[in-house]
């Protein structure tokens, strides 16, 4: 639910086009629709949850409960109406009034997992500007989202653990069909570094805790973690 506020803040500070103009492509797509791809059709046939939601079932499935097939055109006039409201009335229309009331009602009415979202939660929501989180990797500085996001910390740890490795030597190899594919050694090194990074992420990173960002991205600490990567899978990594 924070996306609209975030986009509105970005538009206020950096936007060049009128707010309403930005919605036109999405409105057109919602009204004219798109064709279900073979991949989406396969996913719909396997998904165990969508059919349990009345709105999703009406959108993705036939009246008899079978999923709509590849080649079927899906349109979403309800989404188009929402987007037209936001385009004309601005971001506040998402956080107060009929749209907000409908979202709260939907969350509370879920048959198996009702939530506690309130009208006050939506009405009081504000987008926050945060300083980016940056780390060094060889000659580059890489920046991304800070906490409470966890992605940049994980990337910083992975890069840090692999910094001493000659990754440039592990160039992609030619596959059987002529396509380039990552070498097995490169995949192994990345997978093990990611395994360690996510073990730390699960232990130390959450929304409402004091995350030890400096320690997690410390070069010496990451060098120690990197030494745990051997020639075979470590199995379950420990934080």
Region locations from a protein language model:
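Gly/Pro-rich active-site capping loops and adjacent beta-alpha segments
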Residues: 1-14, 151-188
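Short alpha-helical scaffolding segments that buttress acidic/His motifs in well-ordered protein cores
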Residues: 26, 83, 158, 193-197
